[in-house]
């Protein structure tokens, strides 16, 4: 199934964080937090203004992004977990 987000919504695939600390300790699954970085896999056309114009999004498919801990709505597509969020939920693009 292929999804095309509407307006200023973005579909993000979480990027898993390291399971080992800098000191060499492994973090158990129960202690890990959900990652706050991901990759944009689909994006809408842009945000509609009050006068009907469409402002293009700053992020594009393939961008690595940082987002807030509680950002987005979890969705499952073809057995894979994604986050659907608005562009405003994106904190930064990792370059």
Curated annotation (Swiss-Prot):
SMART domains: Cpn10
Main location: cytoplasm
Alphabetized Pfam families for the sequence: Cpn10
Highest taxon of the lineage: Bacteria
SUPFAM superfamilies linked: GroES-like
Annotated localization: Cytoplasm
Coiled coil feature spans: none
InterPro entries: Chaperonin_GroES, Chaperonin_GroES_sf, Chaprnonin_Cpn10_CS, GroES-like_sf
CDD domains found in the cross-reference section: cpn10
Gene Ontology cellular component annotations, sorted alphabetically: cytoplasm
Keywords: Chaperone, Cytoplasm
GO molecular function: ATP binding; metal ion binding; protein folding chaperone; protein-folding chaperone binding; unfolded protein binding
Protein's GO biological process: chaperone cofactor-dependent protein refolding
Gene3D superfamilies documented for this protein: GroES chaperonin (2.30.33.40)
Family label: Belongs to the GroES chaperonin family.
Protein task: Together with the chaperonin GroEL, plays an essential role in assisting protein folding. The GroEL-GroES system forms a nano-cage that allows encapsulation of the non-native substrate proteins and provides a physical environment optimized to promote and accelerate protein folding. GroES binds to the apical surface of the GroEL ring, thereby capping the opening of the GroEL channel.
Subunit and partners: Heptamer of 7 subunits arranged in a ring. Interacts with the chaperonin GroEL.
PANTHER family assigned to the protein according to its UniProt record, in alphabetical order: 10 KDA HEAT SHOCK PROTEIN, CO-CHAPERONIN GROES
The name this protein goes by in its record: Co-chaperonin GroES
Upper taxonomic lineage: Bacteria, Pseudomonadati, Thermodesulfobacteriota, Desulfuromonadia, Desulfuromonadales
């Amino acid at each position: 199934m292929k999804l095309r987000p509407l307006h200023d919504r973005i579909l993000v695939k979480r990027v898993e964080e390291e399971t080992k600390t800098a000191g060499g300790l492994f973090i158990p699954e129960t202690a890990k937090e959900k990652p706050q970085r991901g990759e944009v896999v689909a994006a809408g056309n842009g945000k509609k203004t009050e006068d009907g114009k469409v402002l293009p999004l700053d992020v594009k498919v393939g961008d690595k992004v940082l987002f807030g801990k509680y950002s987005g709505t979890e969705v499952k597509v073809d057995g894979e977990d994604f986050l659907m969020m608005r562009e405003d939920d994106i904190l930064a693009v990792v370059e």
